[in-house]
Structures are given as C-alpha cells and as structure tokens.
Amino acid sequence: ASKKTKGRIMKTQTKPLDIRDFLHTKEAIVEYINEAYHDDDPRMFLIALGNAVRSKGVSKVAQETGLGRESLYKIFSGSASPKWDTLKKLLDNLGIEIYMRTKSA
C-alpha cells in the first residue's frame, strides 16, 4: 500500500499474515481446525492442524506426545500421511476432541 504526501509517494511496510498469531486459545484453534475440516480441499485439515501445532511449538508437542519432530514436519508438509493414532495424539495434546453428529439436511 502507498499514500501521497506532498507529491511524494510513501510506501507502507506490511508483513505477511501468519495465522499462528491468532491461535492462542483452545477456542480459536478448534474453530480454525473445524473450518479447515469442512473445506472442500482435504489437505486443509492437515495444514490447519500443522499451524495449530506450530503455534504451540513443534518441539514441545513432539516431546509431550512422544512423536518425532521430523515426522511431524513431514506430515504437515504433505510428504507423509498420518495414521489415526497420530492425529488423535496431536488433537489430544491441543485439547481437542472429535465427535460425530448427523448431517443437517
């Protein structure tokens, strides 16, 4: 973005949006991951889960869950597919539980 000041154009410095800056509460993380789950692109769920884990700290989550840090990076980069027990450990660590309900018509 830029604006004019006495005939000169001054550029405004901006930084890229980092969603992790907004994932400080369990409620925010749940809402974010839930929206990603309902996205048409199934990769969005893992991207959102990865952002939530990164907001807490990958090393910390790896230590608390017993999962390898490198394995987590592979999952979140899309180069590895996680097993259900891995997803469950990550969600549990973030304080999130999944429940099922019938679809509304």
Tell where the protein language model's regions lie, with residue ranges.
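Residues in the helix-turn-helix
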Residues: 60, 71, 86
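Alpha-solenoid HEAT/Armadillo repeat architecture
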Residues: 38, 54, 77-80
